[in-house]
């Protein structure tokens, strides 16, 4: 009886606070060193801007994405020059220690001809992405799709079938719109468009399987530019088949707007257990800024507790209770130090990516938050004596005084990393 009551209490507690993420079971797709789906960690992707007119410039951009943590990097395959550059790109990445199969070729209507004209160059690709809505037009669309799938089968290359809201097959849309119009109570147009996305993706995947591409070589995506549509489409797609799924908004925009929109959609789906690989599609302000989309992907995954890439620093926003300039300097110094040391620590102290550090500005929440972190430092607040309480694994370690509080705390951080994760 007690056991039944305990189970009931646990169920009630989970219904109130929310249980842990239950991941959808999808078919595993291997791309070089990474596995998409099958319960593997969510894979981070990006796409190179390319098109600089200088191969060396494009190579450095792609290398920058890899160094930032992109595990798969998509490049446009839209010309003879672009497909002939694939071996050079792969060679450049491999020479820096990266996977020889991390480059994904993305083509449209011209991709079938390019794959068949330059088969040896294209064979360096780890994955191919095609959009069934613009791989060709009319009868040629089906022939091109079949040609790409046959190439992938011959060279044992996985394929992402990526359907986009803005480039859906017009014949399919027309049929679904006509069917909807004949209903006594037609659905809104956006609902029909959602159905068209899912239908196009599933029909294309089924066609690829009939041609001979194994299920464990297929990844699907159905991208929209609006968060609600994205969530609705992927919810329906995830219930319809077990293909591995690639998440992302097709056009998120620039800056803060793009980051918030992408995070809202991707995080929502990941918390539902939907999604095996993600890309944040931000409009870059410069070639150097392209790696921002990789950083956002990593922050989404880390904030949800799905993957850990770096030690996490928690800090309060500051208010009238804090000595803000001093507190700001402390937060900035701790963040800068951890960022600078992380690449070294990840090699010599691999568990450090799970470390949490709290930097708090006053005694209201400072001690409590500091106790919840591996390491925490709490300032007393504005107008108080300039002392800082330091906590280690939930217990008060010491109190720092004077002008070198930051330096002394960083020494404590360094010592802790080597003791805890050495």
Swiss-Prot record:
Key words, A-Z: 4Fe-4S, Iron, Iron-sulfur, Isoprene biosynthesis, Metal-binding, Oxidoreductase
Catalytic activity: (2E)-4-hydroxy-3-methylbut-2-enyl diphosphate + oxidized [flavodoxin] + H2O + 2 H(+) = 2-C-methyl-D-erythritol 2,4-cyclic diphosphate + reduced [flavodoxin]
InterPro entries recorded: Dihydropteroate_synth-like_sf, IspG_bac, IspG_bac-typ, NO2/SO3_Rdtase_4Fe4S_sf
Cofactors required: [4Fe-4S] cluster
Pathway(s) this gene product operates in, as recorded in its UniProt entry: Isoprenoid biosynthesis; isopentenyl diphosphate biosynthesis via DXP pathway; isopentenyl diphosphate from 1-deoxy-D-xylulose 5-phosphate: step 5/6
Protein family: Belongs to the IspG family.
HAMAP family, A to Z: IspG
PANTHER family linked to this entry: 4-HYDROXY-3-METHYLBUT-2-EN-1-YL DIPHOSPHATE SYNTHASE, 4-HYDROXY-3-METHYLBUT-2-EN-1-YL DIPHOSPHATE SYNTHASE (FERREDOXIN), CHLOROPLASTIC
Binding residues for [4Fe-4S] cluster: 316, 319, 362, 369
Cofactor annotation remark: Binds 1 [4Fe-4S] cluster.
Top-rank lineage group of the source organism: Bacteria
Identification of the protein by name: 4-hydroxy-3-methylbut-2-en-1-yl diphosphate synthase (flavodoxin)
Purpose of the protein: Converts 2C-methyl-D-erythritol 2,4-cyclodiphosphate (ME-2,4cPP) into 1-hydroxy-2-methyl-2-(E)-butenyl 4-diphosphate.
MF terms (GO), sorted A to Z: 4 iron, 4 sulfur cluster binding; 4-hydroxy-3-methylbut-2-en-1-yl diphosphate synthase activity (ferredoxin); 4-hydroxy-3-methylbut-2-enyl-diphosphate synthase activity (flavodoxin); iron ion binding
Organism: Anaplasma marginale (strain St. Maries)
Name of the coding gene: ispG
Its EC number(s): 1.17.7.3
Single biological process term from Gene Ontology: isopentenyl diphosphate biosynthetic process, methylerythritol 4-phosphate pathway
């Amino acid at each position: 009886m007690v056991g039944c009551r305990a189970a009931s209490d646990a169920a009630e507690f989970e219904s109130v606070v929310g249980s842990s993420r239950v991941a959808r079971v999808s078919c595993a797709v291997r791309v070089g060193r990474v596995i998409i789906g099958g319960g593997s960690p969510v894979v981070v992707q990006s796409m190179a801007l390319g098109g600089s007119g200088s191969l060396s410039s494009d190579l450095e951009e792609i290398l920058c994405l890899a160094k930032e943590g992109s595990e798969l990097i998509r490049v446009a395959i839209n010309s003879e020059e672009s497909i002939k550059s694939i071996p050079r790109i792969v060679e450049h990445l491999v020479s820096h220690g990266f996977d020889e199969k991390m480059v994904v070729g993305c083509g449209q209507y011209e991709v079938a001809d390019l794959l068949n004209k330059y088969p040896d160059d294209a064979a360096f690709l780890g994955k191919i992405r095609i959009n069934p809505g613009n791989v060709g037009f009319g009868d040629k669309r089906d022939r091109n799709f079949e040609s790409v799938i046959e190439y992938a089968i011959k060279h044992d290359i996985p394929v992402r079938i990526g359907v986009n809201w803005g480039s859906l097959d017009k014949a399919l849309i027309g049929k679904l719109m006509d069917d909807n119009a004949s209903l006594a109570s037609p659905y809104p147009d956006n609902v029909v468009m959602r159905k068209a996305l899912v239908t196009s993706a599933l029909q294309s995947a089924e066609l690829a399987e009939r041609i001979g591409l194994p299920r464990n070589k297929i990844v699907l995506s159905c991208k929209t530019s609006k968060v609600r549509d994205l969530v609705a489409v992927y919810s329906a797609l995830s219930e319809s088949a077990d293909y591995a799924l690639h998440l992302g908004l097709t056009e998120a925009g620039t800056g803060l707007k793009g980051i918030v929109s992408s995070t809202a959609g991707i995080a929502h789906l990941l918390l539902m257990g939907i999604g095996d690989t993600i890309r944040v599609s931000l409009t870059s302000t410069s070639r150097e800024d392209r790696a921002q989309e990789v950083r956002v992907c990593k922050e989404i995954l880390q904030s949800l507790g799905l993957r850990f890439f770096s030690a996490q620093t928690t800090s309060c926003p500051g208010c009238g209770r804090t000595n803000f300039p001093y507190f700001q300097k402390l937060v900035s110094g701790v963040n800068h130090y951890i960022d600078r040391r992380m690449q070294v620590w990840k090699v010599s102290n691999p568990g450090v990516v799970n470390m949490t550090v709290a930097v708090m500005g006053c005694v209201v929440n400072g001690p409590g938050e500091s106790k919840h972190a591996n390491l925490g430092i709490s300032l007393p607040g504005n107008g108080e004596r300039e002392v800082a309480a330091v906590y280690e694994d939930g217990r008060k370690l010491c109190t720092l005084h004077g002008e070198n509080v930051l330096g002394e705390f960083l020494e404590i951080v360094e010592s802790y990393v080597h003791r805890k994760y050495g």
